[in-house]
Amino acid sequence: YENVFGSGVWSQSMEGVNMDDYVKDQVRSKLIRVKCMNLSAKEKGVVLSRTQKDAVSSAADTFFNALTQEQVSALNVTKDQIEKMFTEFAIADTLYDDVTSQINTEVSSDDARVITIQYICAGSKSDISSAKERLDNGESFYSVAKDFGGEEESETECKRGEMEQAFETAAFNLKTGETSSIVEAGGKYYIIRCTSDNEKSKTEANKTALMDEKKLEYFNSVFESYEASKYVEMNKKVWN
């Protein structure tokens, strides 16, 4: 954080919480989750393969050897401790994969589709009707959109679930190059033009992200009660 935001980052606020406390809470939650996942893995007999163990050892060596002597002293850490930490994370990942391997995470290409649109937005029906008339008379979408949106066209990349439903339905029903009729959504009026009805590489990336979300939602649904049943005590002297 300091490398990106500077040393003053810890006095800033995140979601109404001091940054230092926010980061500690996030790390604490992550550590508790990993420890509980390792306990569950032990109960279920989940272990690392030889290949995984070798990869963990190699990664720990690489990480430790990249630390300066000053960093090693400041962290007060040994290579064995790094390898133990990496091993726990690898076991947690293995448990996660095992638990989520049997669920259906299929996402259709249409549900994952990412499109690019331009739109004209107006606060009144009369204004958007005026814009529609100009388009119907052959004026370019760019020219009309510029008058309603400032110096540049209003252009955006869209995924399902990000917009008002009426806007989304109209936008995703368009083919490349098509323009919608007047759409009312969220108390405003729009005319939408589709510049790409499928950004294929971004659609594939979004499909992967949606599948990962499904896995995480499922894992949380089955693991949170287990985690809540465990008593975890932090070493306050070390933690603070």
Set out the residue ranges of the language-model regions.
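Short, well-ordered alpha-helical segments enriched in acidic and aromatic residues
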Residues: F141-G150
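N-terminal targeting/tethering segments
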Residues: Y1-V77
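Residue-level recognition of oxygen-bearing side chains
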Residues: C36, D127, S140
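Short helix-loop boundary/capping segments
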Residues: T156-E157
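PPIase-associated folding chaperone regions across multiple families
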Residues: Q71-E133, K146, E162-N240
